[in-house]
Amino acid sequence: MMAGNSLRSWILQALVVLLCGGMLAPIAVVVVASFSGGGYLKFPPESLSLQWYFRFLGDARWLASLWNSFVIALMACVFSTAVGFLAAYAIARGAFAFRNAVVALLLMPLIVPHIVTAVAMYFLSARFGLVGFKPWIALAHSVVALPVVLIILQSTLKTIDPNLERAAMISGCSRAGVLRHVVLPLAMPGLISALLFSFLTSFDELLISLFLAGIRAETLPVRIWNSLLLEVEPTIAAVSSLLIAMTIVALVIEWTIRKMRSNELSTSH
Amino acid sequence: MPLYRISQWALIAPALVLVIALFMMPIAWFVGASLAELGSIDAIWSEAKSVLGSRAILGAIWTTNVIALVVTISALIIGYPLSYALSRAKGLAFSLILICIVVPYFTSVVVRTYAWMVILGRNGIVNQVLLSTGLINEPLNLMYNRLGVVIGMTYVLLPYMVLTLFGAMKAVDSRLLQAAEGMGARPLTIFAKVFLPLTLHGVMAGSLIVFILAIGFFITPALMGGTGDIMMATLIEREIEVSQNWPVAALMTIALLAITLTLYALYGRFADRSGERFV
């Protein structure tokens, strides 16, 4: 489109570099600031140190919230991936009544404002004394993690040839057997991504936790939130950097799996 | 075969039960029970009228829509060229642009908001730089006002715009652009007459998804906004946490849900056309 016009394409390239830089800059700023040596956040830092990381690791309340988030996210990702896998398989293979309505309903938690979901869940939980109960919070997180799992697994299951399943069934495999011995292994890369991203969804979730956590199950985002409302303490930069590192690790794992799979496919054909 | 049908529903049942029991029913129950507190239908009606007549609430609804609109337009202006570059890039350039969009996309919203608080705060980076160069004598107020909210929210919602536009732009057949060029059309003409019309449904879908997410947004406006930037989500939270006025919270929820679901239905019509529907 811009072949004959080098100035125009140069301007576009410069703009794209600028915008991409702008997307990454805020994240880079937090990571750099987390290593600052001074008493408050200065950018660029005058000296480097790990003091904010040590302060985070030496604070029992921060560590407790990290542990709470980890436990809740682990339960939520296993549960939402298991439930989501079964549903995604039925949706991918089935032409059943109300299919579109069911899909729309299951994806709804992504669209409905989280404040509404959180308040409604709080209304329910307060009446049954479930505020602060970790498995319950994990279950609540599963509701918002489920759409993420469905979207990831839908695209994975689409790439699995239904003829493989038919072949297994003709050879005498039961439906459950097909699911376990054919679909599950083939969908494994997608399942790992689903686990990773539903874990992240729960680990980063703030609003539902804010209402359901109480004092007993304060999660990391809730702890950050409470501290941000008071003052911007630099420990948050260290905590944030850990969360950013976790995101990048998840993305690298996901990328590696996809790369391995595409290599597998290209060598097997 | 009927057995097949039954097993389909058995597979989908756990997910359905989860969403109905922990999402649909709680919302219906919260709204229903809160309104029932008022007693009669007449009482609900008069409460709804007084809520809609209240300056604070009307103001919040207005503010919410204005902020959501400005954020949507900003995201479109920034997202369109970014998405165009992504859709035409190959190899390493493609990976690099994608990383710049996907890493923020999957980073916690609280962390991304905090990042902008570090940049725009009173002792933030922008003020430190401007003060040290002598361009200003006292710190600028870049945060705790509408400017801060719009910057923070645009940053958080931009990836949704870029990824939706990307789906529409990737689907454009580059031979159409070459044909237009071959027939002597100038780059701007090609853009206005060929590329833009072909990606317009993506523009609509992306704008709608950003607007939908913006009107229900809580974290960024609550952290970066000032007293004049109370949005609907913040108001619902305050009615419950501070005033414990459940009926008003329920009425606000109905209003927010009505806007969200109407726009979501509209979004579906545009998004289905681009094929790359990811929400």
In which residue ranges do the predicted regions lie?
Chain B
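Transmembrane alpha-helix signature in integral membrane proteins
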Residues: 55-88, 154
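Transmembrane alpha-helices
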Residues: 14-23, 73, 99, 103, ...
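Membrane-interfacial helix termini and adjacent extracytoplasmic/periplasmic loops
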Residues: 45-46, 113-154, 188, 224-228
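Non-cytoplasmic
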Residues: 26-30, 113, 161, 202-237
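Interhelical loop and adjacent transmembrane-helix boundary motif
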Residues: 2-10, 48-57, 222-269, 273
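Short membrane-interfacial helix/loop motifs at transmembrane-helix boundaries
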Residues: 17-55, 59, 65, 119, ...
